[in-house]
Amino acid sequence: MNRIFFILVAAGVPLSVIGSLMHWPSAVLFAVYCVTIIALASYMGRATESLSIIAGPRIGGLLNATFGNAVELIISLFALKEGLTGIVLASLTGSVLGNLLLVAGLSFFVGGLKYKRQEFNIHDARHNSGLLIFAIIVAFVIPEVFSVGMGNASKLNLSIGISIIMILLYVAALYFKLVTHRGVYQPNNAAQTEEEEEPEWSGKVATIVLFAATIVVAYISENLVHTFHSVAEQFGWSELFIGVIIVAIVGNAAEHASAIIMAFKNKMDIAVEIAVGSTLQIAMFVAPVLVICSIFFPTSMPLVFTLPELVAMVSAVLLMIAISNDGDSNWFEGATLLAAYVIMAIGFFLL
């Protein structure tokens, strides 16, 4: 897999530069940009993981929290700069649906084909359930309900206030998990496994890779955003479909692959943490940061989703909680999550 990503980066980065300079067709550029970003995201993930192991569990957890969805954040910032707030909100929706239904579904399904029953930490599952309900059902639904009788300025002020609260609670959740209650709910062999882990790269190499990959992703993301309109017209895609399906998958593809591989190796704690942890990071950190950053762009972005987006996200949260709160999984539960994702994808495609 690493060799494939290396080839994609080695070919994709030059092609991205040449294609943008020579003004290749938008559809070709769109495909090249997407594949290259996916490959670069894998390098960012591996560099972050190496730095996390070297820095220790607490700093490592903070690094993962900061860079875990860096690609999604970068793409969204450039989309905000272009005033594409609909695509940004849709990509946030897509990340939630993709992580809770597609990634968790594939992880449960692929792992379940090899193992009849897989277990993961039930305490983490229940702790994350509460945060999911807060982040999606409370923090995302309330702005929609209250904004009905509000003007644009009031909507933005409400969204900024909610965003600040969400970031503070996310920091508190990290402090709870990494400091005050670290290891309290972990199985006895978790610490031993963690101690045996070796970084793939040295600190210097990982830092250089992370820095270089971030710069290149930023460059390609800016060009990718410029292809959205023409690609949407050419293929008949709506802004919702581009954001919910395309941008969300491109921004998280490398992380998605990692979760599925972990499930196949029966490391379900890691697979579930990637799926649910990434969802919480998107909802409680990336979305609020984008709302706050939007006030510095010509077009601000209140945290107000469309009704289909809200219904889809709430449904995904409730389904994931119902399936994961028992602390075990099987292939049929994975198939159920995947079926829900396909139904929602069809709905967004037809909107």
UniProtKB/Swiss-Prot annotation:
Name the UniProt key words of this record, in alphabetical order: Antiport, Calcium, Calcium transport, Cell membrane, Ion transport, Membrane, Transmembrane, Transmembrane helix, Transport
Upon changing N99A, the result is:
Decrease in activity
Ways its activity is controlled: Calcium efflux is tightly regulated by intracellular pH.
Q: What is the effect of changing K116A?
A: Almost no change in activity
Changing G68A has the effect of: Decrease in activity
Q: Where, subcellularly, is it found?
A: Cell membrane
Of the GO CC terms on this record, one is: plasma membrane
Q: What is the effect of changing N69A?
A: Almost loss of activity
Task: Cite a single Pfam family from the UniProt record.
Answer: Na_Ca_ex
Sequence intervals crossing the membrane: 4-24, 25-45, 59-79, 86-106, 130-150, 156-176, 205-225, 241-261, 282-302, 303-323, 331-351
Topological type in the membrane: Multi-pass membrane protein
Q: What induces it?
A: Transcriptionally regulated by the forespore-specific sigma factor, SigG, and the general stress response regulator, SigB.
Q: Which GO terms describe its molecular function?
A: calcium:proton antiporter activity
Consequence when changing N64A: Almost no change in activity
Q: In its UniProt record, which GO terms are filed under biological process?
A: calcium ion transmembrane transport; intracellular calcium ion homeostasis
The record's family statement is: Belongs to the Ca(2+):cation antiporter (CaCA) (TC 2.A.19) family. Cation/proton exchanger (CAX) subfamily.
Q: What does this protein do?
A: Ca(+)/H(+) antiporter that extrudes calcium in exchange for external protons. Does not transport sodium or potassium.
Summarize subunit and interaction data from the UniProt record for this chain: Homotrimer.
Protein name per its UniProtKB record: Ca(2+)/H(+) antiporter ChaA
